[in-house]
Amino acid sequence: MKLSELFNPNEFAARHLSFGDEAALLAAVGEKSMDEFVGNTLPQSIRMPSELDLPEALTEADALAKLKGIASKNVINKSYIGLGYYPTRVPNVILRNVLENPGWYTAYTPYQAEIAQGRLEALLNFQQVCIDLTGFPVAGASLLDEATAAAEAMAMAHRVGKVKSERFFVDARVYPQTLDVMKTRAKYFGFELVVSDFAQADEGEYFGALFQYVGKDGDVQDLQDVIGRLKAKGTIVAVAADIMSLVLLKSPAELGADIALGNTQRFGVPMGFGGPHAAYFAFKDEFKRSAPGRIIGVSKDASGKPALRMALSTREQHIRREKATSNICTAQALLANLAGMYAVYHGPKGVKRIANRIHTLASVFADALVSDGLKVVHEVFFDTVTVDFGSKEKADQVFAAALESGYNLRSVNNTQVAAAFHETSVYEDLADLYRAFTGKDTFTFADDVKGRLNAELLRQDDILQHPVYNSYHTEHEMLRYLKKLEDRDLAMNRSMISLGSCTMKLNATAEMLPITWTEFSDIHPYAPEAQTAGYRELLADMENSLKAITGFDAISFQPNSGAQGEYSGMLAIRRYQEAQGEAHRNICLIPKSAHGTNPATAAMLGLKVVVVDTDEHGNVNIDDLKAKAEQHRDALSAIMITYPSTHGVYEEGIRDICRIIHENGGQVYMDGANLNAQIGIMQPAEVGADVLHMNLHKTFCIPHGGGGPGMGPIGLKAHLAPFAPGHTLTDTHSASAGQTSVAAAAFGSASILPITWMYLTMMGKQGMEQATRWALLNANYVAKRLSEDYPILYTGKNGRIAHECIVDLRPLKAESGITETDIAKRLMDYGFHAPTVSFPVAGTLMIEPTESESKAELDRFIAALKSIRREVQKVIDGEWPKDDNPLVNAPHTAADITGEWAHPYSREEAVFPLPFVREHKFWPFVNRVDDVYGDRNLVCSCPPMENYED
C-alpha cells in the first residue's frame, strides 16, 4: 500500500457530492459517462476550452489551518471609532443556538409560512423592538444596512410626499458612508441633495429630509422644533437613529418624524468588518403600502388560530417588477433574529443597564478630560466624546498614543479626535484612554456620575413591555425558547429545499466555523488598513478565484445582496456610458421570463424597460430581440439576461444575443442567479457578458439565513472596472476609487466571505467543476423521473435541462381543480419545502435540487410528488371530494389528527402518506395561513401573550 494514496486532498468534494450514486443516476437519464452526459446537455459553442485555473483542493483541516493563518494577520485593537459600528457582546446562548445552528441559518425566506412560524415569530420580535424604540406603529423585518435604508427612506419620501420638489435635505451630521450611498441613489432618481446644518433644514422647499440622531461626532440635538417646521410645509422627515441611544432618548415618532431607520448591530451582532447587520426601518401606518422590504404580519390559519406570514407582498419586485417600491428581494433575517433575541434575553432592564453604562462611561471620561483642561466639543452626547486639541500635532499625538496602547480612535478632522464608547467598554479602557489623551497615569472618578443628556431629551415611556421580553432571562428559559421556535421551522438540516433559482445547497460546517472567529468578527470596517491584512489577503484570494471562474477582469465585493449586485452592475454600465458621452442611452431590454429584480433595478437607475418575448421553448426570441435592439440602437443601454435562462435551459443563442446587443451600442449584464450551472464548463465573460453579479449565498455556499444575509459581488470587464462602487472612507485599491458607493461598508458583508473562501479552497479546481456537473445530473434525474407523471415545460438540447426544471401543473389544475398552492402545501405533510411556485410561469413548480443532495433524498422527494399525483387522481376520479381532500386541507397539524375527524380520508393518509415520512416526521405548526385576512387586517407587532399560549 502506498502512503500517498492514504492522503486524500479531495475528501471534502466527496462529502459535498454523492460520488457513489453516479452510475445509477447516469443510467436513469440514459447516459454512459459524465462526460457524455455534459456533452449532450451543454451547447458545444459555449464550452470552456480549458480547465479552471484554480488551486488544488485542501482537506477541511488544512483549509481551516490556512485560513487561521490568514485571519491571524488581522490586528484586533479595541475599537472606539464609532460611526455606526461598535463592539458588542453576543450572548453565548444566542451565538450557539441561532448563529451557529443550521436549524436557523439554512432555512429559506419564509414564503411557505406554515413551516416557518419559528423564525417568523423571531422576526416579529425584531419588529416589535423597532416599534417600541422608534415609537412608530409599523416596522419592517430588516433592510441591508443603515446607508441603504436611508436611501430607501429618501425614495419612499418622494413616493408618499406631496411637496412638488426634487430636492432632499440631508443633515450635515449624517454618517459619511450614508451620504455616499444617498448620492449614488439620488443621481438616477433625479433628486438634488442639499447637505447643510440641521437647524437650516426649514429654509428651503424639500420633499424630504434626513436627520442623524445621534450625530456622527457624538452630539445629541433636540430635533423637535426643526422637524415641526418642516412638517408644517409638508416635508416627509426621516431620522437615522442609533438603536442603543433610543433606549434612553425620546423616540423619533415623539420628535415628529415620519420614518426612522438605523443599524441594529449594537444589539448583539459582531462588527465583522462591515457586516452583515440588520438595518431597521419603521414608519407611520399610512405609509405601509409604500415601504421597502419584508414586513411580518399576524394573520390566522384555516382553523382560526393566530398565524404569522410575510405581509403586503404586492409592494415587492417579484410582483410589481419595475413599479415595485424597491428592488430589494431579501432582508437580513438571521441578523435581525440575533438583534431581536438580544432584546428578548436582556429584557427592558438589561438593555437600559447596557445603554446607561455606555453613556455613563462616556460621561466619566468627558468629565475627567474637562477637569484636565481639555476642550470637549459637545456638551450633550450619548456615547461619543469628541475633543478639540487646537492643533494637528497634538491631535495626531493623541491618536498615535491610543493606537500604541491598542485602541482605535476616530480622527474627526485635523484638530479633533473622538472616542465612541460601547457595550464592551470597561474601567481599564477609561484609564488607558485618559493616559493617551492627557499623558497622565492617574485616573480617578466618583461612582455617582451625572450624565450628559438633558432631561428634555430623555424617553418617558416604557419599552419592551410585551411578555416575550420579560420571560426568558435565564439561560435555560432562553435555550428552550430558541429550541421551540427552531422546531417550528423546516430547514435544510431536515430535508432538501428544492427552490428553483435559489440554489439551496449544502452549507458545510467547516465553511461556517470561521465566521465567529474573533479575527474576522471583531474588526471595525474603518479600522486602519495595517490592521486588516488578513481580510485584504482573503479578498485578494477570492478575487483571483472568481476572476478565474467567470473570466472577468475585476471583482467588486461591495454589493451586500444579489439585488445590490444587480444595481451595482447596471450602475457601472450607466457610469461607463456617461463617461463615453452617451448618458442618453436609457433603454434596457429584459426578457419576459426575467426575475422581478431585473426591471425593478433598471427603473431605479432611470432606465426604461422594453420587454423581449420568449419563444415556445422558453428561449429569448432572437428575432424580437434583434428588432427591438435595432429599433432602440441610438438609446440602447443594456440587456439584463439570466444564463442558463430562468426557464432552466442553456439557450443556444447566447453568443448571438450578446453580439446583437454590442452591435447596437449596448452592454450585456448577466444575472448570476444560475451561475451554479456554469462553473468549470463555461465562462460568462467569454460568451459575451460585460458584467455579472454572483450570489455567494447561492452558488458559493453562504447560507440563506431564513431570508438573508446574502452577498452579490460583481465581475466586470476592464472597460467597466473603473465604474464599480468606490467608498468614501476605505481605500479599496481598485480602479473605481473615487466613485460613490452602494453599501455602507467597502466590502459589503465581509465577515461571511470566509464561507465562500472555504468552499473554493476545499473543492479546488476539480471539485468546482464536479459540482456543476452534479447539479446538472441531479436536475436531469429529477426531471426524467417526474416526467412520468407531470409535463416538464421547457427542455433544451437533446431534451435536457440545465440545473433546474419547470413542472407544469396547469393541465392537472384544469382537470382536477387542485392548484399549485395545494400541491405546495401538501408537500409539507411529506416533510418537504415546496419548490418555487408560479415563477417564472404561473401554475408551475420550478425545481432545483443542487449538486449536494444524495440520490436517496432525491428519491424521497420524487416519491412525494408521485404520491401527490396519485392523490390528485383520486380527486379527478371522484374518490375524494374537491373541497375535502388531503391537498386542499394541507398542511395537517398534530392538533388535526388528535381532534375530531370527519374527512373522507384517514388520519394516516393525512400525515403519514408514505413509509419514510414516519421515520422523520416534520409537523407543521399551523394550518394553511389566510393571506387575504392578514393583508386586510395588518398587524406587524407581537400579539397578546394568550395567543402564544393557545
UniProtKB/Swiss-Prot annotation:
Biological function: The glycine cleavage system catalyzes the degradation of glycine. The P protein binds the alpha-amino group of glycine through its pyridoxal phosphate cofactor; CO(2) is released and the remaining methylamine moiety is then transferred to the lipoamide cofactor of the H protein.
A GO BP entry: glycine decarboxylation via glycine cleavage system
Keyword set includes DNA repair: no
Name of the gene this protein is made from: gcvP
Modified positions (N6-(pyridoxal phosphate)lysine) in chain numbering: K698
Keyword Oxidoreductase: yes
Obligatory cofactor(s): pyridoxal 5'-phosphate
Organism per entry: Neisseria gonorrhoeae (strain ATCC 700825 / FA 1090)
Sequence intervals crossing the membrane: none
Protein name, entry field: Glycine dehydrogenase (decarboxylating)
UniProt-listed InterPro entries: GcvP, GDC-P_C, GDC-P_N, GDC_P, PyrdxlP-dep_Trfase, PyrdxlP-dep_Trfase_major, PyrdxlP-dep_Trfase_small
